[in-house]
């Protein structure tokens, strides 16, 4: 059964290229576009995440994913783009040519849940 009201665990976007890409600037431009789409959806739904994941698929279909987690939610588009670009720079040698790029934000918290919820008080006699 499909549950349309399930709690979302991540927000992501990916793009498969018609031709393999080896130019890091083209990769970064596409990652910026993907991050912008993720950020737009994240802002619209008020779901903010603490883990950013970069996905790279090589021409031989090997998939490389690299993540970075933070103590607080990523809310700023420029920060999200910087993190994704940093992940690419750190792992470009592992996948210098790609046919697919992806950006995912996980460890989501709704805006009104970001403060950790309500602290319950226990009464002691």
Label each PLM-derived region with a short phrase.
Residues 1-98, 108-113, 117-119, 124:
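DNA-contacting surface of Y-family translesion DNA polymerases
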């Amino acid at each position: 059964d499909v549950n349309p009201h399930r709690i979302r665990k991540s927000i992501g976007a990916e793009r498969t290229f018609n031709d393999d890409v080896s130019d890091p600037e083209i990769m970064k431009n596409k990652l910026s576009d993907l991050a912008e789409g993720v950020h737009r959806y994240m802002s619209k739904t008020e779901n903010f995440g603490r883990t950013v994941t970069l996905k790279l698929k090589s021409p031989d279909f090997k998939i490389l994913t690299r993540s970075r987690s933070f103590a607080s939610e990523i809310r700023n588009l420029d920060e999200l783009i910087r993190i994704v670009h940093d992940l690419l720079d750190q792992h470009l040698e592992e996948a210098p040519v790609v046919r697919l790029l992806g950006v995912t934000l996980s460890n989501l918290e709704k805006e009104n849940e970001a403060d950790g919820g309500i602290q319950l008080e226990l009464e002691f006699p």
